Every structure is written in structure tokens, then in C-alpha cells.
Amino acid sequence: MDGWRSRFKRLHRTLSVGEEQCTPAIKLNSPDATLQTEACAPEDEGGLPPVQLCGYLSSTRDRLLTAELCAELRPLMPSRIQLYTKWCLLYSLEQHGASLHSLYEHVRPEEPAKARVGYLLIMRDRRGGLFGAYANEPFRPTESRRYSGNGECFLWSADLHPMLRLRAYPYTGLNEFCIYCTSGFLSMGAGSGHYGLWCDEGLVHGVSERSPTFGNDALSREGPRFHIVALEVWRVG
């Protein structure tokens, strides 16, 4: 755990946007013209190869994940997850419709995973705020009061202008309320009547307040209550 926590010593990292120009390699690999885009992010300090982003349609206008954001989020993930170079878009509000049920259906693994993978949640609010969460397992509804997830989970928010600045909120160990999903909402982080990140079944309204689980500030620029403009879930690995 100490080794994992050391990755969060630098929670404010900066990256100049647009310093390196590149032409994505595009492969049409399905009847619905799904694109595979090879992100031209430079190798990070650990010498990891660049990430390949797969799943955006050619018609998709709202694309939340960029090579620059990948480069900032990747070092915060578990070491074994950092080694993966293929990140796949499982759910997009624009591509699949605004429905939590649809999100669960698209995120659900088709077969048992042969190796552990990670899941990245990204949201954007009406003021352009970009934020989300990393989860060690897929989001799936439960009717019990049992939380899931472990200490690998974290919340994050990002400022895009004038340069990309990422702020991450790692697991504090104060409680085990990492992930809790039902048919009516999805949430990460909780305690004392507050959710670190919460969204409703229509993926229209969200809540982000300080939670003991992650010790986070409100992630949205709109404040504790926000409107969801765009949302994506990615599988890392």
C-alpha cells in the first residue's frame, strides 16, 4: 500500500496541451465504423509505450479522453494496469444514450476476465468541468447494501486551460465505501451522508461532495450539485 500511495505524492501535475502534434492511426474494424485511434502520447517517466484509445465512432463529437489526460491518469493506476496499452470505450452517453441501465449493460464483461483490468469514469458538467473516478472492477447494480471496490480506487478532477492540471484523491482507508451501484444510481465514496461522486439513473443529474472514503473536494465546477453533459466509461486493459 505504501508503494501505491507514493504515486499520489504529486497530485498537481501539469502538462502543456498541444506541444506535440500527431496524426492518429485509424482502423475501421467493425460494420458500425468504430474507430481505433492510436494516441500519440509520448512515453512517460517510466518508459511506458503510448496508449491506444479504441471505441469512438467517426461521428462522435464529444470525446472526453485525450492522450494528454491518459498520460496524467496512468501513473496513478496500479503498476500492473499501467502496463496495458489498449484502453477501450465501453460506454458513451453520446453513442449509447443517457441511461444508467445502458451503462451497466455495456460495461458488464462478456466473459470472465483472464487478467485484472481497470475502469475509468469520465464526466463533464455544464461549466466544462472534467472529472471522474478510477475503479478496480466494473460498475454493476446490487440490491444489497454491500459496497465493492478496494483501495486502488480514486477520484480525480482536471483543469484543461491554460494547461492540463490534474488533481487526484486516493483512498484514505477511513471506510470501505468505494463503489456502490443500484438500478437507481451509481456512486463512489460515501460517509456522513455525503457521496464523493453520484449520478442518477437518467445520467442527467449528479452530486459530488467531500467524502471520508477519498477526502475529496467537490469535483464539479458547478458545486455539489451538477448537470451531466457528457459521460464515458473506459476499460483499461
UniProtKB/Swiss-Prot annotation:
Domain TLDc: 63-237
GO biological process, one term: protein-containing complex disassembly
Annotated localization: Mitochondrion
Classification via SMART domains: TLDc (SM00584)
Principal subcellular localisation of the protein: mitochondrion
Mitochondrion recorded as keyword: yes
Function: May be involved in protection from oxidative damage.
A cellular component annotation (GO) from this entry: nucleus
Protein name, UniProt field: Oxidation resistance protein 1
PROSITE patterns named in the record: TLDC
Family, as annotated: Belongs to the OXR1 family.
Keywords: Mitochondrion
